[in-house]
Amino acid sequence: MFPAVLAAGVFLTALADSTRGRIACAVYTLTACLLFGVSALYHRGDWGPRAHAVLRRLDHANIFLIIAGTYTPLTILLLPGSHSAPLLWGVWGAAVLGIAFRVFWVGAPRWLYTPCYIAMGWAAVFYLPDFLREGGIAVLVCVVVGGLLYSAGGVVYGIKRPNPSPRWFGFHEVFHSLTLAAFAVHYVGISLVAYQHA
């Protein structure tokens, strides 16, 4: 998955026509590569206890990064400065706090940190009219559908249900499937925004 995400991110960054757009898309690409790269290492490697603990912290912390990274091109390319600055500062500030929380309390219960991911992800609800006005219905649908898929994944992760086949395709695989679908939908939306503003 990591090579595909990297290639898609490079394409997206090249699609943006302005310096601001390229920087915003590069930030999104970097956070996506960190998420998928670290997740692949964490889940596929046979690590000792110490390396496993470090990778687990990074894996969980990267969720906050991808949320803020996803907001970055949408906010910079779609919102006026009076709206974009508060949203960007808010989500990146929340990301820093969330990362510190997950790094220093890696054993926190799911019921405590999963709602933090979901709440941070839905900060955009106050800006949906702006996204519709500046991006159009297709972009708005991508933002909302991606958010719903991420939220569904968060709920599955939090309650560990459904768990159809624990050995082969359990709740964790359902969670990852939903988040992959959410990422793909958001990527399409961000690509539409970058293309519109190219």
Which residue ranges define each predicted feature?
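Multi-pass alpha-helical transmembrane bundles in non-GPCR membrane proteins
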Residues: 1-198
